[in-house]
Amino acid sequence: MFGKGGIGNLMKQAQQMQEKMQQMQEEVANLEVTGESGAGLVKITINGAHNCRRVEIDPSLMEDDKEMLEDLIAAAFNDAARRIAETQKEKMAAVSSGMQLPPGFKMPF
């Protein structure tokens, strides 16, 4: 099934992938992404662990109704979370792109 040295090569690839994944997870944890809503009137910056680092609200929104502001804040946070998820998915794909996996083997992402 694996041929000569195939299992050894597969184990080596798995170890390399594990190291790359750990490095990628550290990179994503340190990454900061800003999500926006209301055409940039509300901005929320979160890190890769989804911890909020900064909230910016345009002063013009302070005069509007509270409910709209709350909706814009939630939308900005969701935008930032989506951007983190996309970045994480791209980095995971880059980690696994060079591996020669056995037929039918699928990565968990």
Swiss-Prot record:
Pfam families attached to this UniProt entry: YbaB_DNA_bd (PF02575)
Annotated keywords: Cytoplasm, DNA-binding
Transmembrane portions of the chain: none
InterPro entries from the UniProt entry: YbaB-like_sf, YbaB/EbfC
Recorded superkingdom: Bacteria
GO molecular function, a single term: DNA binding
Compartment annotation: Cytoplasm, Nucleoid
GO cellular component terms, semicolon-separated: bacterial nucleoid; cytosol
Stated role: Binds to DNA and alters its conformation. May be involved in regulation of gene expression, nucleoid organization and DNA protection.
Subunit-structure text: Homodimer.
Family, as annotated: Belongs to the YbaB/EbfC family.
Protein name, as recorded: Nucleoid-associated protein PC1_1077
